[in-house]
Amino acid sequence: MAEHILVGLSSAPSNARIIRTAATMANAFGGSFTALFVRTPNYEAMSEENKERLRQNTTLAQALGATIETVFGDDVSYQIAEYARLSGVT
C-alpha cells in the first residue's frame, strides 16, 4: 500500500516549509499527499494578509502535487483526526 501523507493548510508563514516537507516525504515513499484546510467560523474574521498567505500556501501545495481538501468545523484537531481516520492517511 502506498503512503498517504496529510498536511494541514494554514496562513502561518511556516506552513510553506511544512508543505514542502510533506511533498518530499510523499515522493520519497512513492505515495501521495493531501493538504487539508479546516474552515472554522473564524475564517471570515481573518485579515486579508492571512487569507492571501493561505491562498499562496494552497497554490504551493497544488503545484507540488497535493490533493486539496476543505472541511468545516469548530474543532480543528478533531476535524483533522476525523479526516485522517476516514481517508486512510498513513
Locate predicted features.
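Small/aliphatic-rich secondary-structure junction motif
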Residues: A2-A63, E69
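Structural beta-alpha unit
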Residues: G65-T90
